[in-house]
Protein backbone atom coordinates (compact mmCIF):
# COMPACT_ATOMS: atom_id res chain seq x y z
CA UNK A 1 0.00 0.00 0.00
CA UNK A 2 1.44 3.36 -1.06
CA UNK A 3 2.22 5.85 1.67
CA UNK A 4 0.11 9.01 1.54
CA UNK A 5 1.67 12.08 3.09
CA UNK A 6 -0.53 13.73 5.73
CA UNK A 7 0.70 17.26 6.52
CA UNK A 8 0.95 18.49 10.10
CA UNK A 9 -0.54 21.95 10.55
CA UNK A 10 -0.60 24.39 13.45
CA UNK A 11 -3.44 26.91 13.42
CA UNK A 12 -3.68 30.21 15.29
CA UNK A 13 -7.35 31.23 15.36
CA UNK A 14 -8.85 34.53 16.48
CA UNK A 15 -11.18 33.92 19.43
CA UNK A 16 -13.97 36.17 18.17
CA UNK A 17 -14.32 35.13 14.54
CA UNK A 18 -12.27 32.28 13.10
CA UNK A 19 -12.36 30.13 16.24
CA UNK A 20 -16.12 30.65 16.45
CA UNK A 21 -16.34 29.76 12.75
CA UNK A 22 -14.42 26.55 13.45
CA UNK A 23 -16.80 25.77 16.30
CA UNK A 24 -19.77 26.35 14.00
CA UNK A 25 -18.23 24.03 11.40
CA UNK A 26 -18.05 21.31 14.04
CA UNK A 27 -21.56 21.86 15.37
CA UNK A 28 -22.92 21.92 11.81
CA UNK A 29 -20.98 18.72 11.02
CA UNK A 30 -19.24 20.15 7.99
CA UNK A 31 -16.62 17.69 6.82
CA UNK A 32 -12.95 18.73 6.64
CA UNK A 33 -9.58 17.02 7.38
CA UNK A 34 -8.39 16.92 10.99
CA UNK A 35 -4.70 17.57 10.32
CA UNK A 36 -4.65 20.92 12.12
CA UNK A 37 -3.91 21.47 15.81
CA UNK A 38 -5.48 24.70 17.02
CA UNK A 39 -4.22 27.42 19.35
CA UNK A 40 -6.82 30.03 20.22
CA UNK A 41 -5.58 33.62 20.43
CA UNK A 42 -7.57 36.69 21.38
CA UNK A 43 -6.59 38.44 18.15
CA UNK A 44 -4.75 37.41 14.98
CA UNK A 45 -2.58 40.49 15.53
CA UNK A 46 -1.10 38.76 18.58
CA UNK A 47 0.52 36.04 16.46
CA UNK A 48 4.22 36.82 16.77
CA UNK A 49 6.66 35.93 13.96
CA UNK A 50 8.52 33.83 16.55
CA UNK A 51 5.43 31.61 16.97
CA UNK A 52 5.27 30.93 13.24
CA UNK A 53 8.97 30.22 12.84
CA UNK A 54 9.00 28.00 15.94
CA UNK A 55 6.12 25.97 14.56
CA UNK A 56 8.03 25.30 11.35
CA UNK A 57 11.28 24.56 13.19
CA UNK A 58 9.39 21.98 15.27
CA UNK A 59 8.37 20.11 12.15
CA UNK A 60 5.02 21.56 11.13
CA UNK A 61 4.42 21.32 7.39
CA UNK A 62 2.14 24.34 7.38
CA UNK A 63 0.94 27.19 9.60
CA UNK A 64 -2.55 28.67 9.38
CA UNK A 65 -3.62 32.00 10.84
CA UNK A 66 -7.32 32.85 10.90
CA UNK A 67 -8.75 36.22 11.85
CA UNK A 68 -11.64 38.63 11.43
CA UNK A 69 -12.25 40.28 8.07
CA UNK A 70 -10.46 43.60 7.59
CA UNK A 71 -12.52 46.36 9.15
CA UNK A 72 -14.27 43.94 11.53
CA UNK A 73 -11.63 43.51 14.25
CA UNK A 74 -13.13 43.48 17.75
CA UNK A 75 -10.38 45.77 19.07
CA UNK A 76 -9.71 49.44 18.35
CA UNK A 77 -6.10 48.54 17.52
CA UNK A 78 -7.35 46.64 14.43
CA UNK A 79 -5.02 43.74 15.08
CA UNK A 80 -5.95 41.90 11.89
CA UNK A 81 -4.29 44.70 9.91
CA UNK A 82 -1.12 44.05 11.88
CA UNK A 83 -1.50 40.33 11.23
CA UNK A 84 -1.61 41.01 7.49
CA UNK A 85 1.72 42.83 7.70
CA UNK A 86 3.31 40.08 9.81
CA UNK A 87 2.18 37.42 7.33
CA UNK A 88 3.78 39.27 4.42
CA UNK A 89 7.06 39.63 6.34
CA UNK A 90 7.08 35.97 7.42
CA UNK A 91 6.41 34.82 3.86
CA UNK A 92 9.41 36.86 2.70
CA UNK A 93 11.54 35.30 5.45
CA UNK A 94 10.46 31.79 4.45
CA UNK A 95 11.30 32.49 0.82
CA UNK A 96 14.66 33.90 1.90
CA UNK A 97 15.65 30.64 3.62
CA UNK A 98 14.39 28.49 0.76
CA UNK A 99 11.04 27.40 2.23
CA UNK A 100 7.92 27.69 0.08
CA UNK A 101 5.97 30.70 1.45
CA UNK A 102 2.69 29.00 0.52
CA UNK A 103 3.17 26.84 3.61
CA UNK A 104 1.95 29.86 5.58
CA UNK A 105 -1.63 30.95 5.03
CA UNK A 106 -3.75 33.77 6.42
CA UNK A 107 -7.52 33.69 5.97
CA UNK A 108 -10.45 35.76 7.19
CA UNK A 109 -13.39 33.78 8.59
CA UNK A 110 -16.31 35.31 10.46
CA UNK A 111 -18.17 33.60 13.30
CA UNK A 112 -21.05 32.76 10.94
CA UNK A 113 -18.87 31.21 8.21
CA UNK A 114 -18.50 27.63 9.35
CA UNK A 115 -18.70 26.35 5.79
CA UNK A 116 -15.95 28.78 4.71
CA UNK A 117 -13.69 27.52 7.52
CA UNK A 118 -14.15 23.94 6.36
CA UNK A 119 -13.43 24.94 2.75
CA UNK A 120 -10.23 26.92 3.41
CA UNK A 121 -8.78 24.21 5.67
CA UNK A 122 -9.57 21.52 3.11
CA UNK A 123 -7.95 23.60 0.37
CA UNK A 124 -4.86 24.36 2.49
CA UNK A 125 -4.30 20.70 3.31
CA UNK A 126 -4.69 19.77 -0.36
CA UNK A 127 -2.06 22.36 -1.27
CA UNK A 128 0.35 21.11 1.42
CA UNK A 129 -0.01 17.54 0.18
CA UNK A 130 1.08 18.75 -3.25
CA UNK A 131 4.07 20.60 -1.72
CA UNK A 132 5.19 17.56 0.26
CA UNK A 133 6.84 17.39 3.71
CA UNK A 134 8.65 20.47 4.97
CA UNK A 135 12.21 20.46 3.68
CA UNK A 136 11.77 17.44 1.45
CA UNK A 137 9.46 19.39 -0.83
CA UNK A 138 12.06 22.16 -1.08
CA UNK A 139 15.04 19.86 -1.50
CA UNK A 140 16.62 20.96 1.81
CA UNK A 141 18.17 18.35 4.09
CA UNK A 142 17.24 18.16 7.77
CA UNK A 143 20.46 19.73 9.08
CA UNK A 144 20.31 22.55 6.55
CA UNK A 145 16.70 23.28 7.41
CA UNK A 146 17.46 23.29 11.14
CA UNK A 147 20.34 25.73 10.61
CA UNK A 148 18.23 28.12 8.55
CA UNK A 149 15.38 28.22 11.06
CA UNK A 150 17.76 28.68 14.01
CA UNK A 151 19.43 31.55 12.16
CA UNK A 152 16.21 33.37 11.29
CA UNK A 153 14.73 32.79 14.77
CA UNK A 154 17.77 34.46 16.35
CA UNK A 155 16.98 37.56 14.28
CA UNK A 156 13.32 37.89 15.33
CA UNK A 157 13.89 40.79 17.79
CA UNK A 158 15.83 42.67 15.09
CA UNK A 159 13.21 41.85 12.43
CA UNK A 160 10.43 43.16 14.69
CA UNK A 161 12.41 46.38 15.12
CA UNK A 162 12.75 46.71 11.33
CA UNK A 163 9.01 46.09 10.96
CA UNK A 164 8.12 48.72 13.53
CA UNK A 165 10.50 51.37 12.22
CA UNK A 166 10.45 50.80 8.44
CA UNK A 167 7.59 48.50 7.45
CA UNK A 168 4.64 49.33 9.70
CA UNK A 169 1.79 50.57 7.51
CA UNK A 170 -1.99 50.78 7.74
CA UNK A 171 -4.20 50.31 4.69
CA UNK A 172 -7.90 49.66 4.23
CA UNK A 173 -7.72 46.90 1.62
CA UNK A 174 -5.75 43.72 0.99
CA UNK A 175 -4.71 44.98 -2.45
CA UNK A 176 -2.94 47.96 -0.87
CA UNK A 177 -1.01 45.69 1.51
CA UNK A 178 -0.08 43.35 -1.35
CA UNK A 179 1.10 46.25 -3.49
CA UNK A 180 3.25 47.67 -0.68
CA UNK A 181 4.91 44.44 0.44
CA UNK A 182 5.51 43.25 -3.12
CA UNK A 183 7.06 46.57 -4.14
CA UNK A 184 10.69 46.97 -5.20
CA UNK A 185 11.24 49.36 -2.28
CA UNK A 186 10.33 46.71 0.31
CA UNK A 187 12.44 44.11 -1.52
CA UNK A 188 15.37 46.53 -1.41
CA UNK A 189 14.90 47.11 2.34
CA UNK A 190 14.89 43.35 2.90
CA UNK A 191 18.11 42.93 0.97
CA UNK A 192 19.81 45.81 2.78
CA UNK A 193 18.58 45.16 6.32
CA UNK A 194 18.00 41.41 6.64
CA UNK A 195 19.83 39.31 4.01
CA UNK A 196 23.34 40.05 5.30
CA UNK A 197 22.26 39.67 8.94
CA UNK A 198 20.79 36.25 8.16
CA UNK A 199 23.95 35.04 6.41
CA UNK A 200 26.11 36.19 9.34
CA UNK A 201 23.75 34.45 11.77
CA UNK A 202 24.11 31.19 9.83
CA UNK A 203 27.91 31.51 9.82
CA UNK A 204 28.02 32.10 13.58
CA UNK A 205 25.86 29.03 14.20
CA UNK A 206 28.18 26.91 12.05
CA UNK A 207 31.28 28.17 13.88
CA UNK A 208 29.76 27.27 17.24
CA UNK A 209 29.75 23.63 16.10
CA UNK A 210 33.36 23.55 14.84
CA UNK A 211 36.11 25.76 13.37
CA UNK A 212 35.70 26.29 9.63
CA UNK A 213 37.64 27.81 6.77
CA UNK A 214 36.22 30.29 4.29
CA UNK A 215 36.00 27.56 1.67
CA UNK A 216 34.14 25.17 3.96
CA UNK A 217 31.60 27.84 4.93
CA UNK A 218 31.18 28.74 1.28
CA UNK A 219 30.41 25.13 0.39
CA UNK A 220 27.98 24.55 3.26
CA UNK A 221 25.96 27.75 2.73
CA UNK A 222 26.26 27.78 -1.07
CA UNK A 223 27.77 31.28 -1.02
CA UNK A 224 30.71 32.58 -3.01
CA UNK A 225 34.07 32.76 -1.15
CA UNK A 226 34.07 36.55 -1.62
CA UNK A 227 30.67 36.85 0.07
CA UNK A 228 31.80 34.66 2.96
CA UNK A 229 34.99 36.71 3.34
CA UNK A 230 32.96 39.91 3.47
CA UNK A 231 30.68 38.50 6.17
CA UNK A 232 33.63 37.17 8.18
CA UNK A 233 35.49 40.48 7.98
CA UNK A 234 32.38 42.32 9.14
CA UNK A 235 31.87 39.85 12.00
CA UNK A 236 35.54 40.10 13.01
CA UNK A 237 35.29 43.90 13.23
CA UNK A 238 32.31 43.49 15.55
CA UNK A 239 34.25 41.04 17.72
CA UNK A 240 32.05 38.06 16.84
CA UNK A 241 34.67 35.84 15.18
CA UNK A 242 38.44 35.59 14.90
CA UNK A 243 40.95 33.72 12.76
CA UNK A 244 42.81 30.97 14.59
CA UNK A 245 46.39 30.94 13.26
CA UNK A 246 47.08 27.44 14.57
CA UNK A 247 44.04 25.75 13.03
CA UNK A 248 43.96 28.08 10.01
CA UNK A 249 40.22 28.42 10.51
CA UNK A 250 37.69 30.88 11.85
CA UNK A 251 36.32 30.38 15.35
CA UNK A 252 33.90 32.30 17.59
CA UNK A 253 35.62 35.22 19.34
Question: What residues fall within each predicted segment?
Answer:
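Iron-sulfur-associated redox domains of electron-transfer enzymes in respiratory
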Residues: 1-233
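Minor-groove-contacting beta-hairpin "wing" of winged helix-turn-helix DNA-binding domains
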Residues: 247-253
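A short, conserved structural fragment
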Residues: 236-247
Amino acid sequence: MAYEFEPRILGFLCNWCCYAGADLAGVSRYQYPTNMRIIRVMCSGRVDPAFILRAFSNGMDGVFVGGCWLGECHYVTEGNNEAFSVMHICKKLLKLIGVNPERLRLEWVSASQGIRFAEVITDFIKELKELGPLGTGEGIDTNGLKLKFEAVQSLVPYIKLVERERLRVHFETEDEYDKFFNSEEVDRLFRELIVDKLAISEILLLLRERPLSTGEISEILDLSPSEVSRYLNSSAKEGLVRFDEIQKCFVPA
